[in-house]
Amino acid sequence: MPAMDLLNYCIIVRCGPDQESQALSALEFTQALLVQGHKVERVFFYQQGVLTASSLRTPAQGELNITKLWQQLQIENKLVLDVCIAAALHNGIVDKTESERYELGAHNLASGFQLAGLGQLAGATNACDRVVTFGASQ
């Protein structure tokens, strides 16, 4: 049996953390790729997916903390977790730089995540063998 070709993937997460089954599918798919030896160029959180990157998220008792699961995966695999800056700002998610820029006095981008523009997504999709999107457009 021939060896499996290892591919370079870009994952786009458009579903919010409250859409637990879709959000968990994105995480588990990414985990499976890494276990199989594939490379994940980056994970790009877009539209409602940016809500995953809020350090202020506190899921209800019994719900998964998808933010912490992504953070753990990022640490273990040195993943790039990009968050669309326009969608993040629209949803009140800012890093220290944007907080200072807009004189907000606080920031809430969870550790392990970074703000990025659509240019990073475009570059990643050109560099990847496969692009997989989770979540319906809103």
Regions found by a protein language model. Name each.
Residues P59-H90:
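A glycine-rich helix N-cap at a beta->alpha junction
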Residues T30, E41-Q47, L81-A87:
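Short internal beta-strands
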Residues V50-A53, L89-N91:
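Short, active-site-adjacent cap segments at secondary-structure transitions
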Residues M1-P2, L69-Q72, G117-A122:
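Short, charged beta->alpha transition segments
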Residues I85-Q138:
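N-terminal glycine-rich phosphate/adenylate-binding segment common to multiple enzyme folds
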Residues Q22-V43:
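Histidine-anchored nucleotide/phosphate-binding helix
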Residues L6-L7:
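Protein-protein interaction regions
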Residues C10-L24, A53-T58:
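Short, glycine-rich nucleotide/cofactor-binding loops
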